[in-house]
Amino acid sequence: MLARIASACLASGRNESDVELVAITKNHPAEVVAELVDLGHLHFGENRDQEASPKSLRLAEIRPDSKPTWHFVGQLQSNKVKSVLRYARVIHSIDRASLVSELAKQLPKFEGSYSGFIELNLTADPGRGGVLPENLPALAESVLNLENFELLGVMAVAGLGEDPKAEFEKVLSASRKLQELAPSANQLSIGMSEDFEVAIAMGATHIRVGSAITGPRPTNA
């Protein structure tokens, strides 16, 4: 995996250090995460609080000296915000005003710094997670007002069956609009196991890779 990232960075004239690999460990036990910690990896992504919360506690038990950074990458329900903030420092899926309101309520209760991305909906399906690009500036304004929270940029998932390059072009366009409002919010959380090399070529700063690192999910997951 690291060799593929290095090759993609070399091909696009980028430094490997500019791309953060977030290992998606959903449906895998804390023991698998511990193996990755032993290899020196410390950035992990989860998409369900009911799985991630106990997993983070278990990892702290079996690797008490490790200091992982947990990324929450799934659609975040407002009633799960408080629980997620107990372990995740980076939220990749901010997508609506009600979620920002709950973050504003809960963030002051926690110490340390947090950061995250606004998730974009690249489809015409309003039921899918993410904010439509035309609504990005208004949502960004509210995120920028959060206490102790840094807006890093935008996140998106390329649609199934869609050309990832064309999809990521939409993300780049939205990112440029966001930077007019918040110049430092220039990071891109794009790219998964199937398309991370395209994402790196398009400027990804965070890639979210699961099966290419951990292998297939357990059959009972």
Predicted feature residues:
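Conserved alpha/beta-domain cores
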Residues: 2-194, 200-202, 214-216
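Divalent-metal-activated hydrolytic enzyme cores
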Residues: 205-206
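Active-site loop ensemble at the mouth of alpha/beta enzyme cores that anchors a bound cofactor
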Residues: 220-221
